[in-house]
């Protein structure tokens, strides 16, 4: 499956380049600049996330709706997640991509997971779509707090991924380090498989809830989510203000004993700066004028107010135009 998705991604990228052309370092400009052949206006590759995560599912729904109802054709593809998507935008291999709100800030400032890469500023914000909950998943009922993860086999996401840094932040809030656990570096689907097979004790999953991989796991195993208590959540947010508290309702997954308190980051759509203003305007307007037609539970959480609340990375001019029509001013380059 992964090999198939890789081949599809390579083919789509090749077709996109051939059809679109353009220099990704060209100026954003305004409506007049959009007429330039150097602006990409169609056949956009939307790099999402792993095939067991919410990025992949939501991205597919959005891509299909935009392609069907506008002149902009969008193809969603699986990817390695936030950091991989930003690198794909920068290289020109994708024109749209999902990112956690913390990871995009790391990229724009060249910090944390992007410390070795240096600052990447060739992308802009399109919309903050929904919150991604930090879900600490286990099938071991004896693991009740983050502190209980000490000495356990714990998947903390792919090395260098957004999930990895979220896990490190949360472990740190409880006085734990990576060395205090037996870390495993797995994506969502692989983590779910490892939990199912008893190869790991817990896994960090950062995605909109419900998440496909956890839902699937709960059909055959007793699944538990570990809460982050208010004291530790408040301390984490004071240190890392891009987190916010969130409650995962008990009915989100089969078998949960009650509501789960945790923290979350934003799920943000980004665009390469060389995508035309008109294309991004059409993309954004299609989402927010038709959220009731998007066949995914996360669509109910999407709002223009949330979409326009990012401050760490400026907005694409095409997105800014749409928000301005709704009476909201957002920062642009």
Stretches with model-predicted labels:
Residues 59-64, 77-116, 139, 144, ...:
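Pocket-flanking alpha-helical
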Residues 41-69, 73-74, 132-197, 309, ...:
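Bilobed "Venus flytrap"/periplasmic-binding protein-like clamshell domains
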Residues 101-103, 110-114, 178-269:
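Pocket-lining segment of extracytoplasmic ligand-binding domains
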Residues 1-43, 333:
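Short, low-complexity disordered leader/linker segments with a strong preference
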Residues 131-143, 236-241, 262-278:
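A bilobed periplasmic-binding-protein/Venus flytrap-type ligand-binding module shared by bacterial periplasmic
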